[in-house]
Amino acid sequence: MREEIKKLIEISRHFGKDKDYVVAGGGNTSFKNNEYLWVKASGSNLDGMKEEDFVQLERSKIQRVLNKSYTTDAIEREIEVKKDLLKCAVYPEKNTRPSVETLLHEIMDQDYVVHLHPTIINGLLCSKNSEKKVKELFNEEVLYLGYIDPGYSSAIAVEKALQEFNNKHGKPPRAIFLEH
């Protein structure tokens, strides 16, 4: 097993075992190098992750999914995107589905990405004036986005917002908050 995947398993289990970070095994993690992205398979729980619980995908194919023109119908688009992501798998015979947030992991510059739903943060993001509160707590160090449907829509919106943030601040945000 690659050292990077051992580290990814360790990171996944660390956050997965702490119920302050995840609810019912939710959230997802990934590692990427120049060629491949390993992302948590749908239906896997972070606290018990093993090597086979990650889907290895070809990044060049994921980029084609990101750049493809899809229908404007949100439901049809997500069905098409999920089918296209399955075609990115290095080992399709494993019959594992990549996380619906795979594209979000791909657009991040970081090698390791941890996407969680901590209860306390969910409470904050579901509250009135959540954007104002996030800015009060974290200043300009984080990126805040209003509600966006998960999957393709959120990846495209976050990618655009990240570019704007980087242009304004000259560096990436320390964290990204997506409203619920």
PLM feature spans:
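Glycine-rich flexible loops
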Residues: 1-180
